[in-house]
From Swiss-Prot:
One Gene Ontology molecular-function label: helicase activity
Reactions mediated catalytically: Couples ATP hydrolysis with the unwinding of duplex DNA by translocating in the 3'-5' direction; ATP + H2O = ADP + phosphate + H(+)
Name of this chain's protein: Large T antigen
DNA-binding region ranges: 203-323
Main localization of the protein described in the UniProt heading: host cell
Source organism: B-lymphotropic polyomavirus
C-alpha cells in the first residue's frame, strides 16, 4: 500500500475521504467512504467539482497501482511474510533450520530483476516439487474415540517406497487423485437431515371460511395464520408490539397425518392487506412454514376451530359475540328505485334523469317546483324519492346509475316493439298524450288557443281530418311499399311545420340524409327502435327553382330503396353499438321543388303538395301559435282528430279518454267559435281576435 501514493498524497486522500489517517490500507473502509463522499463532492448534487476530480485521481491511482503489484508478485502477502529462518525441506512443510549465508547467496541483487520474479523462482524450486502429503485418516470420529498415545514415528521408507515416492513426485496429477480417493474411502459423507413434512396449505375443512384470492389489494380485519406451535406462541406475543392493532386473538392446535401445527386467529381493529400481515409473520419465521389468509366468515370459522380436531390453547377474550364480526353496513343509494322511476316517467335521457333526481334531494315542503306543479314527473315522485335522492347526491357513481336506468327504459321499449303490434303501440302513445294534456291543457283560454292551431291546419289542407287519418293509417299499418308519406312544396308552405307535428305525435326522430355517404350509416342508426322517422328538407341534384341549392339527399335516398320499401330487414348501426337488423320504420319526407326520380317517388304511398298562402303567414305573425310551438306539437294533431272524428273511429282502449276530451272541447269551444277562428285566419288576423276578449268581458 505504501508504494501506491506518497505520504502527502495519502494524507490528502484520507482527508478527502473524511476518515482517520490511521485507516490507510483498510480498503473496505476506504471504498465505503469513497461512495459516501462522492455524493457530497459530485457537481450534479451541488458539490465541489475540484475536490471530486482530485478524489477520483488519487483513488484511481491507488486501485491501478495495487492491481499492478498483485499481478507482478502473484501473492499480496508473500513479500511481507517471508522469513529467512524457514525453507521447504525434503518433505512438505517440514521445519528445517537453514544456513543464513546459503540463503543470502540466493537473494537477488537490488539492481537485478524484481523481487516478485525471484520469489516465484525460489518457491517453485524449493517447494512445488515436494508438495505432497501422505496421510491416513481413521473412519471413526475424534469425538467418539478417547485420545490415545502418540504413535511411534514411521520407519524409514524402503527403496521400493522411495521409488514409489519419486514416481508420485514426478506426476502430481496422480498424487491428487490418490489423496482424493483416500479421503473418500476413509471419511464417509455426512448424512443429510431428513426434512420434516410441511403442509402446503390450510386444512381442507377450513377452505370455505377463507379467502383464496392470490393477488388482491382488498383490506380485511380478520386473518388466520397457520404455522408451528413454537412460532405460533411467539407470534401470539409479538403481534401486540407490531403496527397491527389486535382486538381479538386466539390460538388453536391442530394435528393430522403430516404433523402438528397451530392456527392463530386474529381480528384487528383496522383493516390490513393480507400481504402486510404475512410479511410481519415471515420476518419472524426463518425455517418454519407459514401460511396466512384473510377470513371471510369469522364467526363460522371460530365455531369450527372450537370443535375437534382443533383445540383451543389461549385467547385474549373469553369467547366472541356475533356483533364483533359484523360490520356496520353503510346505507347506499337504491339503484333499482331510480330505474323504476325512469321507467314510470319514461325518461330516456341520462342528463335529464340526473338533473331530475338531484332536485329530489330538496326538502319536499320547501320545493317551489312542487308548489307550481309544472311537471308531472317532479311533483308526483318528489316525496317518495327524497330519501334515496339524498343518498344519490353523495354517490360517486351518479352518471353510471342514471345510465343503467336509461338502459332499462330503452330495453323495455325494445321489448314492447317485439311483443306488441303497431296498433297497440299507437294506443299506448294516445294514452300518454292524453295524460300529458291533463297536466297543462285546462281552462277556456288555453283550450281556445290550442283549437286555433287546429283551425290553422284545417285552412292549410282541404279535408285535413281525412288527410291526417290517412297518414295515421299508413304509418300504423306500415304495409310494405305503401307506407311512406311525401310532403312537397315551395319555401314557407308549411311542410316542416306539419311534419314536425306528426313526429311529436308518433314520438319519432328526424334524420339528415343530406350528409356525405360515409356518414350516412350512423345517421340511419338513429332509426333503431323508432315508430317512424322524418327525412326533413331532402335536397336533390336537379332543381325546379333556380333559387334552390343542389344536394345529394335524393342520391343517397336512391341507394336506400330497401329501407324505404320495408320488405326486408336492414342493418342499422350506431357508434359503440353492435349492428341491429330490423325493418326500417315508415318515413315522412319533406322536400322543396326538386326533381324526384320515379324510383323514389313510387315508394311513397301519399304525396301532399302544399302551396304558400299569404293569409296563413299573416295570421301567424299576429298570434303566438309559433312562439308557443302549438303548430309543431302532436297535441294539435290529436285535438284535430278528436274534433272531427266520431268516437267509434278510435280503438276501444282509448275511447274512454276520447269521450272525456270531446266533452271538454264541446264545453269550452262551440262550433260558432271555431268557425270564427277559421274566419280570422282567412282574414289574416289573430285567430282569437274578438273571441278571447268577449269571453273575458
Amino acid at each position: 500500500m505504501d508504494q501506491t501514493l506518497s505520504k502527502e498524497e495519502r494524507n490528502e486522500l484520507m482527508d478527502l475521504l473524511q476518515i482517520t489517517r490511521a485507516a490507510w490500507g483498510n480498503l473496505s473502509m476506504m471504498k465505503k467512504a469513497y461512495k459516501n463522499v462522492s455524493k457530497l463532492y459530485h457537481p450534479d448534487k451541488g458539490g465541489d467539482s475540484a475536490k471530486m476530480q482530485r478524489l477520483n485521481e488519487l483513488f484511481q491511482r491507488v486501485q491501478v497501482t495495487l492491481m499492478e503489484i498483485r499481478s507482478q508478485c502473484g501473492s499480496s502477502s508473500s513479500q511481507g511474510y517471508f522469513s529467512e529462518d524457514f525453507y521447504f525441506g525434503p518433505t512438505t512443510f517440514q521445519y528445517s533450520p537453514m544456513d543464513r549465508d546459503a540463503v543470502r547467496e540466493d537473494l537477488p541483487n537490488p539492481g537485478e530483476g524484481s523481487w516478485g520474479k525471484w520469489w516465484r523462482e525460489f518457491v517453485n524450486r524449493q517447494c512445488c516439487d515436494d508438495l505432497f502429503c501422505s496421510e491416513t485418516m481413521s473412519s471413526s470420529s475424534d469425538e467418539d474415540t478417547p485420545p490415545a498415545a502418540q504413535p511411534p514415528p514411521p520407519p524409514a521408507p524402503s527403496p521400493e517406497e522411495e521409488d514409489e515416492i519419486e514416481f508420485v513426485e514426478e506426476t502430481p496429477s496422480s498424487c491428487d487423485g490418490s489423496s482424493s480417493q483416500s479421503s473418500y474411502t476413509c471419511t464417509p459423507p455426512k448424512r443429510k437431515k431428513t426434512e420434516e413434512k410441511k403442509p402446503d396449505d390450510f386444512p381442507v375443512c377450513l377452505y370455505s371460511f377463507l379467502s383464496h384470492a392470490i393477488y388482491s389489494n382488498k383490506t380485511m380485519n380478520s386473518f388466520l395464520i397457520y404455522t408451528t406451535l413454537e412460532k405460533a406462541r411467539q407470534l401470539y406475543k409479538t403481534v401486540e408490539k407490531s403496527k397491527i392493532v389486535v382486538d381479538f386473538k386466539a390460538s388453536f392446535s391442530y394435528q393430522d397425518e403430516e404433523g402438528e401445527g397451530c392456527l392463530l386467529f386474529l381480528i384487528t381493529l383496522g383493516k390490513h392487506r393480507v400481504s402486510a400481515v404475512k410479511h410481519f409473520c415471515v420476518s419472524q419465521c426463518t425455517f418454519s412454514f407459514i401460511h396466512c389468509k384473510a377470513v371471510v366468515k369469522p364467526l363460522e370459522l371460530y365455531k369450527t376451530l372450537s370443535k375437534p380436531p382443533f383445540k383451543l390453547l389461549e385467547e385474549n377474550k373469553p369467547g366472541v359475540s356475533m356483533f364483533e364480526f359484523q360490520e356496520e353496513k353503510e346505507q347506499s343509494v337504491n339503484w333499482q328505485e331510480i330505474c323504476n322511476f325512469a321507467n314510470e316517467a319514461n325518461i330516456s335521457d341520462v342528463l335529464l334523469l340526473l338533473g331530475i333526481y338531484i332536485d329530489f334531494a330538496v326538502e319536499p315542503g320547501k320545493c317551489g317546483k312542487c308548489e307550481k306543479k309544472q311537471h308531472k314527473f317532479h311533483y308526483n315522485y318528489h316525496k317518495a324519492h327524497h330519501a334515496n335522492a339524498c343518498l344519490f347526491l353523495e354517490s360517486r357513481a351518479q352518471k353510471n346509475i342514471c345510465q343503467q336506468a336509461v338502459d332499462q327504459v330503452l330495453a323495455a321499449k325494445r321489448l314492447k316493439l317485439v311483443e306488441c303490434s303497431r296498433i297497440e303501440l299507437l294506443e299506448e302513445r294516445f294514452l300518454q298524450l292524453f295524460d300529458e294534456m291533463d297536466d297543462f291543457l285546462h281552462g277556456e283560454i288555453e283550450i281556445l288557443r290550442w283549437m286555433a292551431g287546429v283551425a290553422w291546419y284545417t285552412i292549410l289542407l282541404d279535408n285535413s281530418w281525412d288527410v291526417f287519418q290517412n297518414i295515421l293509417q299508413l304509418i300504423t299499418t306500415s304495409q310494405p311499399k305503401k307506407r311512406n308519406v311525401l310532403i312537397k312544396g315551395p319555401i314557407n308552405s308549411g311542410k316542416t311545420t306539419l311534419a314536425s307535428a306528426f313526429m311529436h305525435f308518433f314520438d319519432g326522430k328526424a334524420l339528415n340524409i343530406n350528409c356525405p355517404a360515409d356518414k350516412l350509416s350512423f345517421e340511419l342508426g338513429c332509426a333503431i327502435d323508432q315508430f317512424c322517422v322524418l327525412l326533413d328538407d331532402v335536397k336533390g341534384q336537379i332543381t325546379l327553382n333556380k333559387h334552390l341549392q343542389p344536394g345529394q339527399g335524393v342520391n343517397n335516398l336512391d341507394n336506400l330503396r330497401d329501407h324505404l320499401d320495408g320488405t326486408i330487414k336492414v342493418n342499422l348501426e350506431k357508434k359503440h353499438v353492435n349492428k341491429r337488423s330490423q325493418i326500417f320504420p315508415p318515413v315522412i319526407m319533406t322536400m322543396n321543388e326538386y326533381l324526384l326520380p320515379p324510383t323514389i317517388g313510387v315508394r311513397f304511398a301519399l304525396h301532399l303538395h302544399l302551396k304558400p298562402k299569404a293569409y296563413l303567414k299573416q295570421s301567424l305573425e299576429k298570434s303566438d301559435l309559433v312562439a308557443k310551438r302549438i303548430l309543431n306539437s302532436g297535441y294539435t294533431i290529436l285535438l284535430l282528430l278528436l274534433w272531427y272524428n266520431p268516437v267509434d273511429s278510435f280503438t276501444p282502449k282509448v275511447q274512454e279518454k276520447v269521450v272525456q276530451w270531446k266533452e271538454t272541447l264541446e264545453k269550452y269551444v262551440s262550433i260558432t267559435q271555431f268557425g270564427n277562428i277559421q274566419q280570422n285566419i282567412i282574414d289574416g288576423k289573430d285567430p282569437l281576435h274578438g273571441i278571447v276578449i268577449e269571453e273575458q268581458m
